[in-house]
A protein has these predicted regions:
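Bacterial Sec-dependent signal peptides at the C-terminal "C-region" and cleavage site
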Residues: 12-22
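Sec-dependent N-terminal signal peptides
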Residues: 4-13
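N-terminal pre-domain segments of enzymes
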Residues: 20-70
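Sterically constrained small-residue positions within well-ordered secondary structures
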Residues: 10, 63, 109-111
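Sequence context of c-type cytochrome heme-c attachment sites
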Residues: 60, 77-79
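Extended surface/linker regions that mediate inter-domain or inter-protein docking
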Residues: 68-76, 83-126
Length: 126
């Protein structure tokens, strides 16, 4: 019995049992905590889930010397569509995620980040 429980435990934690909560993206209400979306496997370190992809902009806006990290989540291997002279058309359940932060010490990035704010842009049903 103990071996069965251990195997089940390993199976659960080695699969995508803990993945992005796509249903919450489409929900009418917003959750109490950002972590309920499960975009990050480690919220405090901003370590994204494997299906949350980092991206960078070619040209960024100045934001009071803060740094930004950006990620995109597109559900179920769906794809965004490109429309010339317009914005990308993301499928329902997609999310753009942006976190503002300052380094704890500019001279030593290994000391971590002071997280300031995380913003979400959620693609809901039309």
């Amino acid at each position: 019995m103990r071996n069965t429980v251990c195997c089940l435990f390993l199976l659960i934690f080695s699969t995508n049992a803990f993945s992005v909560n796509s249903n919450l993206i489409l929900a009418d209400s917003f959750p109490d905590k950002l972590s309920e979306f499960e975009f990050f496997v480690d919220d405090s370190a901003q370590e994204p889930h494997e299906k949350v992809i980092p991206y960078e902009l070619i040209s960024t806006l100045f934001s009071d010397y803060s740094y930004k990290q950006r990620w995109v989540y597109v559900p179920n291997n769906a794809k965004a569509s490109y429309v010339k002279d317009w914005v990308f058309d993301f499928p329902e359940g997609s999310a753009l995620i942006k976190t503002f932060y300052y380094p704890v010490d500019e001279r030593n990035p290994d000391l971590g980040k002071q997280l300031l704010e995380t913003r979400l842009l959620l693609r809901k049903k039309d």
